[in-house]
Structure formats: structure tokens, C-alpha cells
Design a protein with these regions (language model features):
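Conserved structural motif at the start of ABC-family nucleotide-binding domains
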Residues: 2, 17-19, 72
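The feature captures the beta-strand-to-loop junction immediately N-terminal to the Walker
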Residues: 33-35
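Hydrophobic anchor residue at the start of the ABC signature
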Residues: 143
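Catalytic Walker B motif of ABC-type/P-loop ATPase nucleotide-binding domains
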Residues: 154-158
């Protein structure tokens, strides 16, 4: 469960985030909708402890994200392609992420199987670095890498950005199935 308590973040005079109290429970799927600059990405960065709050805190399963890093073991996230290591191939990157979570190569290969249709023969086996992929395929790599270790908490910022309509439909189905299977 995520608990947000009196969370505030300002950039100069602009208040980007101001949340008195909010809870997100195990199994909830939540989408944030708002105008550009409304603070959605800032909120995600605060939840993931990538930004320091001016006031308040975020806890994940009763762990204050700014004081302890244990929550990272059961959290997957993709905010933008800055999360990717662009001098690796997708395969190398997936194996690297898997290794961070104690997964063997065979386990990573098995966990990639449900994403074959999503990758549509455009990601694996291309023998090129991530930096040379289209924005849509980088988005796919990021989403898959966030889900690879079957996290309890999955945070995806604008997951449909750069994806064609077919890929958007596939990932919506995969996210729904993931939530049903893992919560």
C-alpha cells in the first residue's frame, strides 16, 4: 500500500504537488489524468524518491521511501527513457535488470514470453543498442523491464506515449492480466 501524507513540492512559486492524504491499496490500478505541468510526473518522482519533498512523506508498505530502500525490491518503475541504459542491447538490458533482482537468464527468457506480441519482432534479436531504437520501442523496453521481476508495485508514467494503437491495446490487456495474476 502507498500512503501519501501532507506531501508538497514547489518549484519556485509554482506548487507542483500538494496532497493532504491519499492511500493506494494493494491491487488498485490508478491512472493520473491532468494537463501538462499538472504535477503527475513530479508525484511519481516523489513516490520513487527521485525528488525530495518540501514537506510530507510517502510510505510504501509502511516503509518511508526517503529513509529506507527496502521498498525498491518489490517496486518496478518506468518514467522515461532516461531509465534505460542505452549502450546495451535490449537483451543485455533485460538480463541486467533480471540479475539485479536475482533472476537467472532462463528465468528472464521465460518472463519475456508474455511480451512477445507486444514486442512484435521489433525489439529482441535486432543486434542494435537501445539508443538506436524508435521512441515507441524504447517505451516497450522500459515497460517490460519494469515488469520483469513481477513487482508488487508498478509505476509507469505515460505508458502509452509513443506506442501505436495496436501496442497500446496489447499493453492495456497485459497490465490488466498482470494485476489479476499478481494481486
Amino acid at each position: 500500500m502507498i500512503e501519501i501524507n501532507q506531501l508538497q513540492k514547489n518549484f519556485g512559486e509554482k506548487k507542483a504537488v500538494d496532497i493532504e492524504k491519499y492511500s493506494i491499496y494493494q491491487g488498485d490500478m490508478l491512472g493520473l489524468v491532468g494537463n501538462n505541468g499538472a504535477g503527475k510526473t513530479t508525484l511519481f518522482r516523489l513516490i520513487l524518491d527521485l525528488l525530495q519533498a518540501d514537506l510530507g512523506n510517502v510510505t510504501i508498505n509502511d516503509i518511508d521511501v526517503s529513509k529506507n530502500e527496502d521498498w525498491k525490491q518489490f517496486t518496478g518503475a518506468f518514467i522515461d527513457d532516461g531509465f534505460l541504459i542505452d549502450y546495451l542491447t535490449p537483451e543485455e538490458y533485460f538480463y541486467f535488470i533480471g540479475k539485479m533482482y536475482g533472476l537467472k537468464k532462463e528465468e528472464v527468457d521465460e518472463r519475456l514470453l508474455p511480451f512477445e506480441r507486444f514486442m512484435s519482432n521489433e525489439v529482441l534479436g535486432q543486434k542494435k543498442f537501445i539508443r538506436n531504437f524508435s521512441a515507441g520501442n524504447k517505451q516497450k523496453i522500459g515497460i517490460i523491464s519494469a515488469m520483469l521481476h513481477h513487482p508488487q508495485l508498478l509505476i509507469l508514467d505515460e505508458p502509452f506515449n509513443f506506442l501505436d494503437p495496436s501496442s497500446q491495446s496489447i499493453i492495456k490487456h497485459l497490465l490488466k492480466k498482470y494485476n489479476e495474476d499478481h494481486h
